UniProtKB/Swiss-Prot annotation:
Stated name of the protein: Urease accessory protein UreE
Subcellular location: Cytoplasm
Role of this protein: Involved in urease metallocenter assembly. Binds nickel. Probably functions as a nickel donor during metallocenter assembly.
Entry-linked SMART domains: UreE_N
GO molecular function, one term: nickel cation binding
InterPro entries cross-referenced by the UniProt entry: UreE, UreE_C_dom, UreE_N, UreE_N_sf
Biological source species: Staphylococcus aureus (strain MRSA252)
Principal localisation: cytoplasm
Gene: ureE
Gene3D superfamilies for the chain: Urease metallochaperone UreE, N-terminal domain, UreE, C-terminal domain
Length: 150
């Protein structure tokens, strides 16, 4: 089977639609940005992914669906630093520092997530910014944004 487009996301399905039999494709965070790849579901089904559009995969994306079954993307957990700034000043300070290092980050209402790096952990300790090291799933890929200093 070759998948060329995403059928939707399980987050947008009705409760009755979520009752279908689900096979999962477990991906590493770095694989979410790959438009072309071969994967195997947790039931052993081989799938080729060749997305027509240049979009990243996300947790819950439906790769295939029929009346009874669906194949859904799941994301393996990852070693993260979960940064929990107490003030806007702390958020600005750490965001500036991480931006200078070109580190991709993700945000929730109260947290900043970065992939584990011992240098970042040392920086957080030295600045006194609260954080925890945690194994956690993220919904989207950590993506580097290119730019120049010209």
């Amino acid at each position: 089977m070759i998948v060329e487009e995403i059928q939707g996301n399980i987050a947008n399905l009705s409760n009755s639609e979520k009752q279908k039999h689900v096979e999962k494709v477990y991906l590493e965070n770095s694989d979410l940005v790959k438009r072309i790849q071969r994967v195997v579901t947790d039931h052993g089904t081989e799938i080729g992914i060749r997305l027509k559009q240049p979009i990243d995969l996300q947790y819950g994306d439906i790769l295939y669906a029929d009346d009874h079954n669906m194949i859904v993307v799941d994301v393996n957990s990852e070693d993260l630093l979960v940064i929990q700034p107490r003030t806007l000043q702390e958020m600005g300070d750490i965001a500036h520092q991480l931006g200078n290092r070109h580190l991709p980050a993700q945000f929730t209402e109260t947290e900043m997530l970065v992939q584990y790096d011992y240098l970042v952990e040392d920086l957080l300790k030295s600045l006194g910014i609260p954080y925890v090291r945690e194994d956690r799933k993220v919904n989207k890929a950590f993506r580097h944004i290119g730019h120049s200093h010209d």
